Amino acid sequence: MVKIVLKRIVKILKWIGIVILGLIIVLLIIRCIGKMYYNRTPDGGINETMYVDINGTKQWISIYGQDKDNPVLLYIHGGPFAPTSWADWGVWRKLSADFTVVNWDQRGYGHNYPKYRVTEPITADDMIADGKALTDFLCDYLGKEKITLFGHSMDSIYAANLALDHPEKYDAVIVGALIVDEQESRRRYKEYQLAQTVNDPEMHAAVEQIDPAKEITEQEEIYQQLMANGYATIEDIFAEAETSIVKSIWMNPYCTFGEQYNMIFADTTEYDKMVTGGSIHGEAYGEQLSIANRTQYQVPFYLIQGKNDHNVGTMVEVAVEYYEKVEAPDKDICLVEGGHISPLLCCDQLAAFVHKIDEKQK
């Protein structure tokens, strides 16, 4: 009797294994077909990836557009050093009717890690110099006199500085989840959280301990407490995205499994600390590049921000107040539902905003 039961169990397990193996094979076939389909080059368009020599380093970019004659948009990811190329290609496809979109993994990260990892800290000057060098390369390679910048989160402040310092190189600057001045944003964050925790004595007392003059890393425990107790806006990227995150990851034409693993799961904590000089969040870069008192732009300025972006570094109130002070040949603002990542998650609204910008530039 026992032998009969064991045989049945083995048979069931065997069939379960066959079914699982079959599902894996089907998923891999779907991935292969999807990658091939989305890696096609549009007629009259462009679809390329390459490693560019930038200031003594190799840095990965992808270039995609439906028409080579369209203007060029360079996306500068946030972090710092948090490329989204493992899943963001679907966002840029939505912009590709109006712009040839260049997605850039900055030095030492994304597709560049670990093969082209850096061995010493990256400074704000390095970041700005890389942005200028890549701009010059793209203008030469794609036959343009100028390009448009789109910087998100930490790198919104780099995009703004590049446009402020080198208006001759840019048609416009678009910033999302804008950092204006990190210390001021931390001050406003404290005010916001004091109001949010007024009926929670324990967390209210914790918020009172926040010193806006100190970096997040010096007060990490308080911010973690706030997050653990629900006092932080954390997007559900799978529910809120206006494109399929699963498809964007699984059928990504620009990433292998290994590259996606390195970008999503690899523990780079010690590497990050080395790169940022000990500040894993990299606030020092933002402090050096504050644009609080730099509101005179010689190029059009456009802001897209989540209405509920109460991230400690990108408080929506600070971003909107800065926008109101900006003087530029043209400016516009798009507030979308959601928090810190919503300028990318709400990619249909981003595409409509970018289309509007493109129409103005014609």
Task: Tell me the role of every PLM-derived stretch.
Residues D165-E215:
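A catalytic-pocket lid/entrance helix-loop region that shapes and gates access to the active site
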Residues D126-K146:
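Conserved acidic catalytic loop of the alpha/beta-hydrolase fold
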Residues N311, G338-C347:
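Catalytic histidine-centered segment of alpha/beta-hydrolase-like enzymes
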Residues E202-A292, V299:
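Alpha/beta-hydrolase
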Residues Y297, L303-Q305:
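Short beta-strand/loop motif that positions the catalytic acidic residue
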Residues P80-W92:
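The serine-hydrolase catalytic nucleophile loop
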Residues H310-V318:
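Conserved alpha/beta-hydrolase "acid-adjacent" motif
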Residues L95-P114:
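Conserved alpha/beta-hydrolase
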